[in-house]
Amino acid sequence: MTFKFFSDPGHGWLRVDVASAQAVGLEPSSFSKFSYQQGHWLYLEEDVDAFRFIKAYMDKNNNIPVIREHSSDRPSVIRNYPRIAA
């Protein structure tokens, strides 16, 4: 499975759909208030939440998820999404 990692000059987020998180035993409430949710997409902050998902994914699937990076030199619109209610 392929996931996207978005970054701006200040931070980065791994985009994961809710169903993929649930497939590895995680719910939106498993993540901190520093991550965001827009519809069925979770944007997991890079410092803790993205690692939590990647570790759960690797434990469940015995492989590393494919991650494609997208970076911007401007503040990301992700910062305007609602925060996950932890």
Task: Go through the PLM ranges and name each one.
Residues 1, 38, 66:
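Sparse, context-dependent recognition of short Cys/His-centered cofactor- or disulfide-binding micro-motifs
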Residues 1-4, 29-32, 51, 79:
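Short non-domain terminal segments
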Residues 3-30:
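N-terminal acidic leader/helix
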